[in-house]
């Protein structure tokens, strides 16, 4: 299996620092956390069960449907776009290598071991990476971080003392938007408009002028 790791590193030619950390560090087993620079951590992602994350195929289809133009652009859009690009490239190289190893292994047991290792270990890490960066681009990084914390608190709370359903990421932005609207309301809306002031009757204007003189 060490030879498999070595082949992965040699074949995964990624030019950026994020990809180097992913291929040379994280998948190799070094103590490098690819989420730290985004305010999260591997431990925080580990609170989400493995069946929470969609398949790699679904995540790749989602990223292509939503961000194909930005991902294919030569320009730097955001750190999340860069990390997403390299995760997709690394997964493609990994699949190419796994296919090559599977075709050249004569022993069926060894072939199944390689396929199972890729799907259960590296596949889960890639699914976590893809989900995290797609979610940050879709809902915002702060919303995703709040969701991870909320889910972590929920899952660690004993069942008798927590809500029956886990938090849902898609509902958090709605709450955030409502709060921002309440905080962002301008006090000018409460004051009467200039039209209403002009439409006041002369009698009312006289009474107001008398009060101002007092």
Swiss-Prot record:
Residues 178-207 have a biased composition (Basic residues). Keywords: Disulfide bond, Host nucleus, Host-virus interaction, Repeat, Secreted, Signal, Viral immunoevasion. Residues 186-214 form a propeptide. It comes from the Viruses. GO terms for biological process: microtubule-dependent intracellular transport of viral material towards nucleus; symbiont entry into host cell; viral penetration into host nucleus. Residues 186-208 are annotated as: 3 X 8 AA repeats of S-P-R-R-R-R-S-Q. Residues 25-27 are annotated as: HBEAG. InterPro entries: Hepatitis_B_virus_capsid_N, Hepatitis_core, Viral_capsid_core_dom_sf_HBV. The record marks 185-186 as: Cleavage. Its main location: secreted. Homodimerizes. This is External core antigen. It comes from Hepatitis B virus genotype A3 (isolate Cameroon/CMR711/1994) (HBV-A).
